[in-house]
């Protein structure tokens, strides 16, 4: 996924109210931009980090700029816009990069499903295969090379796991897809120390037949591309 128009850079002052971020532009202007991330963003929002932001063509937006990437003092790149994860996975499937998810003739997004009234991120269909339900999660929490999900307690994520378990138990293909969007992450685990209920459910999901697929992205100010398969460590 290429950024067009190109991203602009600034220095992070602070993130607050979950969706807002104050930045300082190279000319000294202070600007408030939108932050599309409801997580804790641990290690991603340190004051002084370089912020890379996009500009919307929608003139009606109160905050036309969106925080896309963080560049940390030690050189790590992080995609902080969680809305990009689904787009990246769709792009990678269509490009043939995700070998585990090839051979389907139809791809749809945001399809209603499940007993808890959820929407599946990606639905793959083909007349010769079971339907494939894919829930996408963005991983940005880093601790000594280890990536963790979630970075905060997530009742919504727990609901998604219950839905995936139900899909698997009904004999259809069920996939939890971790998009690793932090250049410093070397492997991924469920964050037992942050959300023990999510950890318990992910173990149940694996036992029920839910597949866990992990791909890491290459990131820079020009583009993001999911291109490196990684293992999930329970």
From Swiss-Prot:
> What domain of life does the UniProt record list for this protein's source?
Bacteria
InterPro entries in the record, alphabetically?
SfsA, SfsA_C, SfsA_N
**Sample GO molecular function, one term:** DNA binding
Q: Which family does it belong to?
A: Belongs to the SfsA family.
Could you identify this protein by its name? Answer: Sugar fermentation stimulation protein homolog
Organism field: Photobacterium profundum (strain SS9)
Organism placement in taxonomy: Bacteria, Pseudomonadati, Pseudomonadota, Gammaproteobacteria, Vibrionales
Q: Which gene encodes it?
A: sfsA
């Amino acid at each position: 996924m290429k950024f067009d128009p190109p991203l602009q850079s600034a220095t992070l002052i602070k993130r607050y109210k979950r969706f807002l971020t104050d930045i300082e532009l190279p000319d000294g202007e202070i600007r408030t931009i939108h932050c599309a991330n409801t997580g804790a963003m641990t290690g991603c929002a340190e004051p002084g980090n370089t912020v890379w932001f996009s500009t919307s063509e929608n003139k009606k937006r109160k905050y036309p700029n969106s925080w896309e990437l963080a560049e940390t003092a030690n050189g790590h790149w992080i995609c902080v816009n969680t809305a990009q994860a689904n787009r990246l996975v769709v792009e990678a499937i269509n490009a043939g990069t995700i070998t585990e998810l090839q051979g389907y003739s139809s791809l749809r997004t945001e399809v209603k499903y499940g007993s808890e009234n959820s929407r599946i991120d990606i639905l793959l269909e083909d007349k010769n295969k079971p339907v494939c339900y894919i829930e996408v999660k963005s991983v940005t929490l880093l601790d000594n090379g280890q990536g963790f999900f979630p970075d905060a307690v997530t009742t919504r994520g727990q609901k998604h796991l219950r839905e995936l378990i139900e899909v698997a138990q009904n004999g259809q293909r069920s996939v939890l897809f971790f998009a690793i969007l932090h250049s410093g992450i070397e492997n991924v685990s469920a964050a037992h120390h942050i959300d023990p209920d999510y950890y318990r459910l992910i173990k149940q999901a694996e036992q029920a037949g839910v597949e866990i697929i992990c791909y890491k992205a290459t990131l820079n100010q020009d583009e993001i591309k999911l291109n490196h398969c990684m293992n999930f460590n329970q």
